[in-house]
Amino acid sequence: MASTLSFAASALCSPLAPSPSVSSKSATPFSVSFPRKIPSRIRAQDQRENSIDVVQQGQQKGNQGSSVEKRPQQRLTMDVSPFGLLDPLSPMRTMRQMLDTMDRMFEDTMPVSGRNRGGSGVSEIRAPWDIKEEEHEIKMRFDMPGLSKEDVKISVEDNVLVIKGEQKKEDSDDSWSGRSVSSYGTRLQLPDNCEKDKIKAELKNGVLFITIPKTKVERKVIDVQIQ
């Protein structure tokens, strides 16, 4: 579409010569058309809506026979940070929230190219943390690479499990010295049916294992006499 601008032309006035009188009836109207330009913001928005992600699958040796699949953009829900839920800025999480997060994470996990023990060439992504609720206990796993048991502190405050980790590194040479400190922490609301004074923790090869035993529920049976 084009927009039209209409106006009437009149004679120019010169300071050296007297201007002739021109009546408004003798003015000749004409029109000028300008092409309408599409705003760049609309075009950019259209490109973003039609953008796609390209995922490469089935890569073989020597980069032979690779296929690509077009997928719409979607937000990844899996946390891939080294400590998983150990985020100092995250709010306190409950056990049920962790279990729900694990369910969503495993539903969204995709097989990736690699080697596994079976030799099939496809392996699953390892989550940086895991939690399992069994019949008599709750088991947790947190990946803490580079930390020793002296760097990790676990405590129970009221009904909240507190996990803190801190790692200090000092780098020095002939001309420069520096120190880096990394701290992590999380607070987990424990369920009511657990024995807080019998929680066990073990750190092996940068992996923290926590076992929380559940309280034994004794079922009381009462016989009702029939009259």
UniProtKB/Swiss-Prot annotation:
Confined to pollen grains of budding flowers. Induction: Highly induced in roots, stems, leaves, flowers and siliques after a heat shock at 30 degrees Celsius. Highly and quickly induced by heat stress during early seedling development. SUPFAM superfamilies: HSP20-like chaperones (SSF49764). One of its GO terms (cellular component) is chloroplast nucleoid. Residues 1-43 form a transit peptide. It is found in: Plastid, Chloroplast stroma, Chloroplast nucleoid. Residues 14-34, 56-65 have a biased composition (Low complexity). Residues 120-227 form the sHSP domain. Disruption phenotype: Ivory phenotype seedling under heat stress (30 degrees Celsius). Decrease in transcript levels of class I genes, but enhanced expression of class III genes (e.g. accD, rpoB and clpP) after heat shock. InterPro entries: A-crystallin/Hsp20_dom, HSP20-like_chaperone, HSP21-like. Disulfide bonds: none annotated. Pfam families: HSP20 (PF00011). Residues 14-75 are annotated as: Disordered. GO terms for biological process: chloroplast organization; regulation of DNA-templated transcription; response to heat; response to light stimulus. It comes from the Eukaryota. Transmembrane segments: none annotated. Keywords: Chaperone, Chloroplast, Plastid, Stress response, Transcription, Transcription regulation, Transit peptide. Forms oligomeric structures: dodecameric arrangement of two trimer- of-dimer disks stabilized by the C-terminal tails, possibly through tail-to-tail interactions between the disks. Interacts with PTAC5; the formed complex associates with the plastid-encoded RNA polymerase (PEP) complex not only during transcription initiation, but also during elongation and termination, and with a stronger efficiency in illuminated chloroplasts. Binds to promoter regions of PEP-dependent genes. Belongs to the small heat shock protein (HSP20) family. Chaperone protein required for seedling and chloroplast development under heat stress, probably by maintaining plastid-encoded RNA polymerase (PEP)-dependent transcription. This is Heat shock protein 21, chloroplastic. It comes from Arabidopsis thaliana.
